[in-house]
Amino acid sequence: MEILKDYLLHICFILFPILLYQVFWLGKPAILVPKINSGLVTLFACGASVLCIIFPIHEMDYIQYGLQMIPVIICLFYISTASGLTVAASVLCFELLFYEPSAMFVFTLLPFLIIIPILFQKKWPFMSKAKKLLLSLLISCVEIFLFFASSWILSALNILNFQKSGIFVYEAAVSGLFRSSVLLLSIYIIESIAENIALRSQLIHSEKMTIVSELAASVAHEVRNPLTVVRGFVQLLFNDETLQNKSSADYKKLVLSELDRAQGIITNYLDMAKQQLYEKEVFDLSALIKETSSLMVSYANYKSVTVEAETEPDLLIYGDATKLKQAVINLMKNSIEAVPHGKGMIHISAKRNGHTIMINITDNGVGMTDHQMQKLGEPYYSLKTNGTGLGLTVTFSIIEHHHGTISFNSSFQKGTTVTIKLPADLPH
């Protein structure tokens, strides 16, 4: 019964910081998934590891058993190498200061346990939940094997002496199984929390889009008809005789340009109101990306911006090619307008990743702050002086209608990367 109490205590040490972080940091309502607070996660992970060392599960031949390595693995996968190494260093220092025999095992296992997460660190965010759990199980098996191997090596060198080898093997196996189970449980909970947060963000965005679409449907048609009449009478008003005056010609140009801008805004409203009008078919996304890039080259040249396109061949996808093309154009246009004149670089790529097709649009523009990224996609929010924000709102709707996701990774004055993920599965 005592050992069961120790096991439950260690489970609390590992899972409580995860749930605490979810409540205080990820529980904030936001359209986009909140950015990970690396410092806070690292602090929680260090605390969890130290508690596992202070309150070990049991002792045998002066060896402490615990779950102190699990926060290291979690930080390496979900935060960064620096975060994982910080937690690992805190574990090793605490072991050396207070539990020297255990530090021998930590020092032996640590390099091997760190290498595997670092090797898969870049691929980890794009793995499915099943693959992540499978990789975590592999790491646990490697840890158990290395633990047994280092135990016998240290015993053979008379550094540590295990008097009851049978009991040691049994307890080490039970401890290894327990560590594997808690690591898998932790990964599963983290992935479930991430899925729920993403779903919540989509629901918040969908509610806002529904309100805007209803408004667009009721207002757009009523406004478009008077604008058409106004445009016709403006052209009649500024006849050939009137246009001989230079100021009159400038007035006509200004009035017509503003009417065209109003017409464009109404068109965007109608695009949101007609989200049900999608003509889906199987098409080659790589060809669409190349075609869209070619169309945007002239606009980019006007802004002295270089556009590069890189796509894998035969990226077949099921969707509305016209709508997706509009979404890509909107994003590329925003990128071109965000980069400095004469020094701009836009790179668009498309590739398959399992059952997902990823489109990345990267620029070296002015970038965005976290607050600005949180508001992207909201109607009427724009980073441009004369912008309405409707173009990006329409883009969000198009991606959402194709059961995809769109995310932004940006640093102020360093550039932005837009990532679109679309399902690659074709209808049977």
From Swiss-Prot:
The modification Phosphohistidine is found at H221. GO terms for molecular function: ATP binding; phosphorelay sensor kinase activity. GO terms for biological process: positive regulation of sporulation resulting in formation of a cellular spore; sporulation resulting in formation of a cellular spore. Residues 1-6, 59-68, 121-132, 188-428 are cytoplasmic. One of its GO terms (cellular component) is plasma membrane. It catalyses: ATP + protein L-histidine = ADP + protein N-phospho-L-histidine. The keyword Membrane applies. Keywords: ATP-binding, Cell membrane, Kinase, Membrane, Nucleotide-binding, Phosphoprotein, Sporulation, Transferase, Transmembrane, Transmembrane helix, Two-component regulatory system. Residues 28-37, 90-99, 154-166 are extracellular. This is Sporulation kinase B. The gene is kinB.
